[in-house]
Structures are given as C-alpha cells and as structure tokens.
Swiss-Prot record:
Major place of residence: mitochondrion
Keyword vocabulary terms for this entry: Membrane, Mitochondrion, Mitochondrion inner membrane
Cellular-component GO terms for this entry: mitochondrial inner membrane
GO biological process, one term: oxidative phosphorylation
Protein name as it appears in the record: Cytochrome c oxidase subunit 8B, mitochondrial
Signal sequence coordinates: none
Protein's cellular compartments: Mitochondrion inner membrane
Family assignment from sequence similarity: Belongs to the cytochrome c oxidase VIII family.
Pathway: Energy metabolism; oxidative phosphorylation
Species this protein is from: Thunnus obesus
Assembly, per entry: Component of the cytochrome c oxidase (complex IV, CIV), a multisubunit enzyme composed of 14 subunits. The complex is composed of a catalytic core of 3 subunits MT-CO1, MT-CO2 and MT-CO3, encoded in the mitochondrial DNA, and 11 supernumerary subunits COX4I, COX5A, COX5B, COX6A, COX6B, COX6C, COX7A, COX7B, COX7C, COX8 and NDUFA4, which are encoded in the nuclear genome.
Summary of the function given for this chain in its UniProt record: Component of the cytochrome c oxidase, the last enzyme in the mitochondrial electron transport chain which drives oxidative phosphorylation. The respiratory chain contains 3 multisubunit complexes succinate dehydrogenase (complex II, CII), ubiquinol-cytochrome c oxidoreductase (cytochrome b-c1 complex, complex III, CIII) and cytochrome c oxidase (complex IV, CIV), that cooperate to transfer electrons derived from NADH and succinate to molecular oxygen, creating an electrochemical gradient over the inner membrane that drives transmembrane transport and the ATP synthase.
Length: 20
C-alpha cells in the first residue's frame, strides 16, 4: 500500500473498506 493510514498498521478489514 503506497498510502498507509496514520495508525500504522492496517488490518485486512480496514484495507477492504479502503478499497471499496
């Protein structure tokens, strides 16, 4: 992921939401 969230880590669920 080129643009990662400020949390630092991204879970599979959050990644799926971001890709929606």
């Amino acid at each position: 992921v080129s643009a990662k969230p400020a949390k630092x880590x991204v879970t599979a669920g959050e990644q799926a939401i971001a890709m929606t």
